[in-house]
Amino acid sequence: MILKSFILGNLVSLCMKIINSVVVVGLYYGFLTTFSMGPSYLFLLRARVIEEGEEGTEKKVSATTGFITGQLMMFISIYYAPLHLALGRPHTITVLALPYLLFHFFWNNHKHFFDYGSTTRNSMRNLSIQCVFLNNLIFQLFNHFILPSSMLVRLVNIYMFRCNNKMLFVTSSFVGWLIGHILFMKWVGLILVWIQQNNSLRSNKYIRSNKYLVSELRNSMARIFSILLFITCVYSLGRIPSPIFTKKLKETSETEEREEETDVEIETTPETKGTKQEQEGSTEEDPSSSLFSEEKENPDKIDETEEIRVNGKEKTKDEFHFHFKETCYKNRPVYETFYLDGNQENSKLEIFLDKKDKDLVWFEKPRVTILFDYKRWNRPFRYIKNDQFKNAVRKEMSQYFFSTCRSDGKERISFTYPPSLSTFLEMIQRKMSLFTTEKLSSDELYNHWNYNNEQKKKNLSNEFINRVEVLDKGFRVLNILEKKTRLCNDETKKEYLPKIYDPFLSGLYRGKVNFFFSPSIINEISIKNYIEMLWINKIYLILLISNYQEFEPKMEDRIRILKFLFDAIIVDSKNKKIVKKSTEIKKEISKQIPRWSYKLIDDLEQQEGENEENAAEDHEIRSRKAKRVVIFTDNQENPDSNTYNNSKTKDTTNFDQTGEVALIRYSQQSDFRRDIIKGSMRTQRRKIAILKLFQANLHSPLFLDRIDKFLFFAFDTSELMKIMFINWMCKNAEFTISDSTYTEEKTKESDKKEKEEIKNRREEDKREEKVRIEIAETWDSIIFAQAIRGCVLVIQSILRKYILLPSLIIAKNMIRMLLFQIPEWSEDLKDWNREMHVKCTYNGVQLSETEFPKNWLTDGIQIKILFPFRLQPWHRSKFKFLSKDPIKKKRQKNDFCFLTVWGMEAELPFGSPRKELSLFEPIFKKLKKKIRKLKKNGFLTLTILKEKRKLFLHLPKETKNWFIKGILFLKEIINKFSKSKRNPILLFGFREVYELNETKNEKNSPINNRTIHKFSTSIRSMDWINYSLTEKKMKDLNARTKTIRNQIEKITKEKKKRFLISERNISPNKLSYNAKRLKFKSSKNILQILKRNNAQLVRKSYFFIKILIEKIYIDILLAIINIPRINVQFFLESPRKMINKYIYMYNKKENNKRIDKTNQNTPIHFISIIKKALNYSNFNKNSKIFYNITSLSQAYVFYKLSQVQVINLYKLRSVLQYHGASLFLKNEIKDYFGVQGRFQFKLKDTNFRNSVMNEWKNWVRSNYQYKYDLSQIRWSSLISQKWRNRMNQQHMIQNKDLNKWNLYDKDQLIHYEKQNNFEVDSLSNQKDNFKKYYRYNILLYKSINYEDKKDSSIYELPFQLNNKQELFYNYKIDKRKLFDMSGGIPVNKHLTEDDIIDTEKSSHRKYLDWRILHFGLRKKVDIESWIDTGTKQKKNLFDWMGMNEEILDRPTSNLEFWFFPKFVILCNAYKIKSWVIPIKLLFLNFNGTKNVSENKKINKKKNNDPFISISSNETKSIQLKNQNHEEKESEDQVDLESVLVNQEKDVEEDYVRSDRKERRKKKQYKSNTEAELDFLLKRYLCFQLRWDDSLNEKIINNIKIYCLLLRLTNPREIIISSIQRGELSLDILMIQKDLTLTELMKKGILIIESTRLSVKNDGKFIMYQTINILLVHKRKQQINQRYRKKNYIDKKNFTESIVINQSLTRNKDKNNYDLLVPENLLSSKHRRELRILISFNSKNGNDINTEIINNNNIKNHAHIIDKSKRFDRDKNKLIKLKLFLWPNYRLEDLACINRYWFDTNNASRFSMIRIHICPRLKIR
């Protein structure tokens, strides 16, 4: 068994060794390389497939030989550096590929030119065989790849650095590739044999019919292969950067060099920005990532005139100085700092160079570097800016760069070596004689490394031992602990650099911040001093590096040079000649290398920065294609002119030096180069297809089905299938709609149609806009098209204005004169003069009539016609247009248009020409009307004549019957009217639906009342204009005519029958007979009324004349046809109209307005009245009744109500008490009944249509216990009882005179001053409190008793308090609006947060706008001060907490919808500071009466400047946006910062003090800018300012109108028309100049919203969070633990003091048990360094820190733990764990090793894989 296991183990280990051996791995990687196919395979396959015969065999052999030879050369080039340099450079591939491709095509197309005619088999003169060999060889060297990734080939290169026996690996990988290649060729051969032997292919009809197909295919195969080769070559070369045309690294000249030199902190391993390189070209596409590109290069290759591009200029080495910051040695950073004079602000320091040096540059250029600069550093693909820390713009290169470094005393290959450092060291070694080129042996290096490590370890150990010894002597521990080293600016004053700039502070504060000189300091003296200082530091840094080696010979010379330089510079530091000396030295020892630029600018930034002194020469980021269109030039000298700048919209504006306002017009074309840095290599967009001529966005082929297709792609079967299916369904469907759902179906259909129409209209608008954009871009892209189009437009404008239109006017008036009509010269000329031709920019910005836009011939022009002339056949009076439909008014065309190239009119630029109104269209319309009237009249006369003829034929028989029918009919009417007095409910006169089918079921006959109500309200909401409603009217008219005819026939048949209510069927147009009788009676009194009211009859004579005409018409024409019909019509129409006139005249005495028009067709629905009245009706329940009131008059119904002596209106109370906007009840009628005492006068409703007031009142009534988001106890204790009683009395005030009310309120306030028992008198500023009560008074009055007032425009009377007068003047009072909040501006502009009237928005509002309360975040303390703080403090505290809960529980979304937003502020305030608000109030109330005194101090310090009261402005800004919960963190952070200032003091007192100081500071600003800065920095750290999105478009439209108005002398007409069209919005008019941030936020232009960026948690924030938890814990401990023991440290013996301190487990305030770990005496950096050095100690592996442990003065801390029996068990485990983790195996050590030891660039990419890849340390 043992033998078997041993054999098995050996076999496994043997297999593992074989698998891991270099040969097997090489074979495997080589085999994988076979699958990376290049274009050379095309030649190989062509030789295999096509060639036949002996010559074909030779070609096959030569192709295979060339192919294998090329691959072998590629493998060898990996190992052999010269061959790698020859083949690996990008320019070698370019130089070889282009000529060879030309030769190859020439060879294929002119084959016989090279053919010498010799066909001998062994002849070497046959060049075709040699060419096959060369093709395969050269194209194998080109190394293009067909597959997407070339990773398979690079696997060999990667594994090269892992193995030691590199030659064996290369050989084995080549053999593996050869095996794979042989297998592949065998597989191809087998496929060819299978094709030849396959009968199915031979039996193909097409192949058999075409005999010469194979021969033709073979002859054209060369052409096919050449095409494929060309495609692959272009495909591959497209990914290789062109070395000639790519833009070189454009450094920001000497300025940016100075920027980088003044960086305070430098890291050893620079961060690489950007992801892994995305280029997919050849292996050597990126020269900087190659292994031997810089290492093995001949140092003599670059001579003295070699140039390195900086800022796009080639400069010789004499122009540059050299300054480095990183050294390879020791892998430790070399820090440099410059102590600059003056302010270090964001400006730039210019160093002036001589022009002579620049002129010599071109002549000294080597021609090779002009064409191929392989050391060129291409730009990254994108540029990511960061305003705070600006890192260098890096190339998108791989993170891995291979170079040699020293690790563990050996030279090893590091895969994360900084490439810039490698290049830099090589250049230094070539050019500088001070650096040795001799390489030390491996033993010397290892000894040197060991020596240095020992020295460092000794130093650190000694320092540590010294600290512990000092501790033994009794010194304090705090003095012995090592502190962090800080960089000091001034040793005398002990001023340190800020933490963020301090290079010695690593980790959290690390970053690069650029400093510059301020412009005031830039002068020649400072520049020279600065240069002098720079040279001193440069020489010092360069030469100081070389004094580190003790073993190296010739050190004396270097030390001598160093001393000489230092002595000279230090002695003569003030001499100006030093600059010359240092420059001479500089020429010998220094050279500047290319530096990464820090800030790249785009085109917009370049234009904005043109006014600056140190502006950049050219932009380096390609921005969107834009054209700058100047729209206004300010000739006046006005430096404070406003600039409109908004870079997010399509149009942006900026000012130039000449005072030009310009819009930037962006092209709508797809711009693939947007935001790409110039010179950066473009990644190939393989997954993007451009299918259209104008394609705005790039699309992946994956989403091709979602793109609008071309015509030949537009055939979509799914749409056709849908249409066919719908048609099939519609054929089989049975439309059976019941009567009850008929109206609902109609409304749904109409709504659906409307939605579809709106949707279609929007889609059509989008389509038209797309077409317009394409047309505009076409004009913009064609050369000289804009100039041609502009000239044509100007010619068309002149032709239209001065030739075409005048000729049309003359022709029209001449024709009118010929037709004997009055000419209209004046009207036509007036309209012609009104037409304006305004020149606009290309995107439609209006300029003026005479001024052309700048560069209009190149940029384009539009001509806008304002008030275009319309030639009319006659002019109507303008009064007739007033009574038009509102829908028709909306559909009227705009009174402007744009001129097209063809002279047509278009509504938008490049839009489709609109249809012009024809001159003859109104003439034809009038003629058609006249013809229709003539036809109608002729038809009536013909029918009358026919009826007369029939009448005369039957006259003798009908005369008897006529008299009998008339007498019986009159008798029945009289009887019916006499009976109707007994039934009062019939006075309502309801009409009944006539049912055509009397045998219908009872369930189906009455339509549901609810559906009718829905139908009526939907019609009401559309202003009674609806297609379905008109359709219904037409159907009702037809039904009426039918029912009238049927009813007349029934009346004639039922002459002798009685009329029963339950059985009769009357048409919808007929009234009940009771109503007819009443009308008949009322008609008797008509003569008396006419005599009394002659004047009114004269006014209303039109109606009486109309009635008389109708009577005459009935008597003369229709009496002959049918006598009963005449009687019925008379009783239906004439008495009804008379009664309406009587009602009108009766109510005219009470109200001066007409209630109801005669013949009113508007449907007013009294559905709820009918619903209530049905309860006490005397009708039979089984009768089929439906109450249709579509034509019933309101006046008639209420007249009937007024006639009743005793009426019970209890059932109608719900209607009459409706507090919202009435949908069916007129206010005047309710007022009339209120006067008569029918119901309460308070039930009167306003004309306010929205239900906003109703919601407001219901909310206030339902939530009266909260009273505006305050708890009930707060509200009850807010003020004294007298004031509450007076406020409640005020709710019942019915006096409409607001001036009296204001006087009454003023008396109240003055009376308040005299009260001494008021509890809030202790506050210092009584005026503020009075104003608060006054404010609440106004709010309550307006909100609760609002509907009792008509035309309520509140005028605030001034009131005097403390001898300070405040006057308000009111402006823009709109009497047409029922509610008009006065937007009064206080004259003295003292707009503090306590002002009553708020002017943040215009007073013209369409909705209720109570904007009085200003609840701020900190104003909650002021609310607290209103309350009696001396009593019930605990309840108040809990109520405040409850108040916040109430705010959270309330649905804020509903509040914001209809409520005024001031109350929502409290909710938002709680969201922002959910923790801080209650804590603050708890702290304040702990202080008892201090609250009032604090408020005294605060109120005394208030400033009257409105823009400095930041808290109020903050609240106004907070209300504008919904806040995210991210704000909690920032606000807590700011407030907790004040809590943690001093932990030893009481937390609450400190919080109150800091808050009070902060509030004082906030009021003591000198300018608006200070307020704005404080506002942004202190409060809104995680907020961002942004434009209101809806304002963007409005502002741009306003700017377009302003451009025209500024140029006009009389712009009034244009202003009015533009306001009517909606182009000019008045609410964003900037009337004032220089608006501050607070005012912009008031107007809603700037909005503060929370940032949506990801917030990186700072170390401070994490610390605050942890301390916050500790504070809470500590607070609990302090409450529970009343007795404390003081801890002390024995000064004599360190270990004894630790033993004494074992009682600390019971004392939970101190954490001194950390001192059990002695290493804590050192700083973390030195601690880490000491551990690593101890682990490197290879000689004494077991002696770990023997100096520390074996010291006599300190006992081993492990014994202390053993001896201590008083420790808790948990604490014991914790200390043991800490001793185990802390000194030896901390995670921090791994991170440190990862960064500094293994040269990893970015610590966040730390992974264990890299540790495994790196060489292991030797363990001895």
Swiss-Prot record:
Entry membrane topology: Multi-pass membrane protein
Keyword Iron-sulfur: no
Pfam families: Ycf1
A GO cellular-component term linked to this record: chloroplast inner membrane
Signal sequence interval, chain numbering: none
Compositional bias annotation for Acidic residues: 256-268
Compositional bias per record (Basic and acidic residues), positions renumbered to this chain: 293-310
Transmembrane segments: 18-38, 67-87, 90-110, 127-147, 175-195, 224-244, 1103-1123
Sorted UniProt keywords: Chloroplast, Membrane, Plastid, Plastid inner membrane, Protein transport, Transmembrane, Transmembrane helix, Transport
Subunit structure comment from the entry: Part of the Tic complex.
UniProt-recorded name of the protein: Protein TIC 214
Native source species: Populus alba
